[in-house]
């Protein structure tokens, strides 16, 4: 059988799982995955054996020959494939149901047996101390919880600050007239380079044509500047921040050597910019190649993130606001700053950043050999290797050894890395002798080790940390810069006269490569620039001070009426077998699997691994749905995972099962409640580890809060929190049009309700996920529309609608529909949520995390900050678009090897102002989120207790810093649901796929809450 996939008009790669599903059906016909224990206490499900057998069969790849054209491909079914898919899924479900009935004795027996496994959570069956592996827990009441208020204002001169934030503000002027300036710059170029009136008139007419044509390269350049320049400004801000620190350290430190190292780091970073921007060099002078992959250094080092692989480098982290001043034609972007301190990299079992990247650079390392052997990842890896080679050479190459007896730190400033790089390294990397290239890379590593560069890095780290720990408040600093569009992006005037093209072909082929012609430089007139935008970069030292305001409250579980169906995911290894026998001899559903299937050495090859994972996720989901189908929202499915691997040497199979359990938990929580938690058992886990794990497992259960002397707004007796995110499921490589993609809308709804006894209950109402074209994702997603209707029917009138910050990447130069940049905060989507319901309030809120340095230890303490950082003129400024109104901080530092715990995270909440005229009442947003008052206090109180409700520790309870991590971020269900297709070059979104499967289950009843 050969699939007959053809590319359609939607510019997406089609998928066809027909053959794979047929193979699953074939194996499933003859194998029953279900068995039960002799005491009838456990249902054992062996999907692993079926998945492994299916993986050994010859299967037509779901993407046919088109995989390399797809960035992701999951649910873009041709019509005829869709029909077969629905039939096959129903057939698989029927086979599973029949197998289950076979071992249990008929249809009614399935329901009876499942009922025998389900136990009320408040029964003695689940009661225990919470210190032993298993499901027993004491569901403790916490009666002495407290939150404390911090403020930006020092109450008196003796008050010591608790937190330090370094704030970055980037102010861009004239962005609203950039198109006009670009046109004038091109007209000036025409006038300077044409000899006669006729040529000038012809080219001016041609210029007018491309200005009018929205699809022209003129507008492509404008869009490129709009979307990519803020990243380049952030890159410049990183170096400016180092200069800011150096300026203040010089007058406050006696560490002469450390100061020299910081000064030299800045010098070398500037040398890279000078080298890449050298006007006397052509693009070809930067061409290098390695392992068959060609790279242009000018292109690579024009990217915003290029410095981030350094061991010590500032990081722009955390979105703090954004505003527009139309009178001054100025737009401000506000961020947090922190420094990366050569932290350990988990992927290498604790190697720090410097050693990790040297290992990638090393031609003899296992990592480089493995990556170069895999075609699908080779280009990306080689780009990284060549980037490390230049960056580490320019920043660290030296002839001065800090451990030598005659070492003179001043000599560091005399070394010129550019000269030796151009004379020694570039001729080799631009040539064709692969052996010499490997020798050069080995030589770079040898030199960095021989001259003990790590000693210098550690000294610099010590200097910066010591300075950042000081309590002296630093004065602000503002630096002026220009964004320059260089003439190098233009064709020669004679060629333009012949072809009518003003711009280099690079803008047509790959716009991002044209970033090399967009530079950020010191503020001065540049005759080689087509046009310039003025920019200010401001760095400020912000402090948070304690106050006497605090609130006390208690928290307890409300598990009455909740029934539990425990599930265990366990490897077949000896350690797991012993743990299972000792701690899990109880009522539960058991999924057993072989944890060696996916190991890199001797495990399944990539194509077979995809088939195995696909089969595991499909059948495990369908099995659990069959077991739970007759139970309502009061069913809780706690999943416990046993892991024989450890943090430094995790099992790939166990990691996959962890990700799978998160995906299953999200899907099942649409109708029930489900959560998963893993326990590492290579060594017997400690009691507090078990307690924290069980607390995490049960963190989504309803909780009731009681307060002392807290006044709440009578208008806010309830609040629904709706959290949304998305994850791409289908997209073509090289297609920059994000509207020609498909994605999964992912979310969660939490209800906060005031009870008759005066307590406040917080509970997860449901999760949701559904697939959409991106065109509809941010405008009229029906799943959100339905959720709002259902919440309204349940009595909710106040809605905190939360997503991650949408305003972080563009200068907003283009005059396109502003909804494109608002994503989940688009006016179209907010209008959909509002509908015709005039008696509801929707608060558009987005959150982010920024980082601060804490001067004290605050274990188990919780703080809130509700000062408005950018308060000036807020009431009178109709152009203010985004303002941060609330911050939460818990003082907890992560105990782990290295220095990742130097900073503390702070969660920020921001809202959008003057965006939704005619849809939402802007007065509500001002009065309820911005200005102090009872309504604002109540809303922020509700948000705070939601953070407390998601705590994942058994003792020293404080608010959970990021309660949205299941929906948004690197550890979200959307991120964890991704794995590679058979060829390894395209992504498969398992959540999006199961959404498609779930559609069949929900056809009869998709409104059951």
PLM regions and their residue ranges:
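Long, contiguous domain-sized segments
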Residues: 2-477, 481-487, 501, 505-510, ...
